[in-house]
Amino acid sequence: MPTPTKGPRLGGGPAHERLMLANLATALFRHGRIKTTEAKAKRLRPYAEKLITLGKRGDLHARRQVLTKIRDKAVVHELFTEIGPRYENRNGGYTRITKIGNRKGDNAPMAVIELVEALNKPATGSKRAQTEEAASQEPAAEAGKQPAEGATSVQTAEAADASQAEGEAEEK
């Protein structure tokens, strides 16, 4: 007889439960944070933290163990090259669960589970990300122009001061 799982059951059978946890972990590692039910977030936390610990180890055996659970090679590569080394000096506690209230349709309690040190990847493809990127580039371009104009005004001011000093020296 199979040993019962700790925590709430997440689906029909054990195979479906394993697939759901693997898919949730894949989404968490890909996006850095996901919105799901509290029960799924609580079941995902230890699962994801064990995978991050394997990612910190970084050897071939650990990579193969992770590949048995997460089938997306790009996500596994990201786990071992970016996420694992980021938590090098941290002993556990890689994820945070924040409760956000109940879902509108069925009143299910919802939560956001996220990696503690957020990924520093800009979002691509969304209009909001494109406008934020454009807005951040405009001040940089203006800032690039201002020192050049300021430098010419400073140079002319220094030249004027120098000519005044010469004029005063000649008068004395």
From Swiss-Prot:
Gene Ontology biological-process annotations: translation
Keyword Aminoacyl-tRNA synthetase: no
Protein family (similarity comment): Belongs to the bacterial ribosomal protein bL17 family.
Low complexity: bias regions: 132-143
Keyword annotations: Ribonucleoprotein, Ribosomal protein
SUPFAM superfamilies xref list: Prokaryotic ribosomal protein L17
UniProt-recorded Gene Ontology molecular function terms: structural constituent of ribosome
InterPro entries, per the entry: Ribosomal_bL17 (IPR000456), Ribosomal_bL17_CS (IPR047859), Ribosomal_bL17_sf (IPR036373)
An annotated GO cellular component: cytosolic large ribosomal subunit
Keyword Nucleotide-binding belongs to the record: no
Location of the region described as Disordered in the Swiss-Prot/TrEMBL record: 123-172
Subunit structure: Part of the 50S ribosomal subunit. Contacts protein L32.
One protein family per Pfam: Ribosomal_L17
PROSITE patterns in the record: RIBOSOMAL_L17
HAMAP family, per the entry: Ribosomal_bL17 (MF_01368)
Signal sequence bounds: none
Lineage: Bacteria, Bacillati, Actinomycetota, Actinomycetes, Streptosporangiales
Protein species of origin: Thermobifida fusca (strain YX)
Entry protein name: Large ribosomal subunit protein bL17
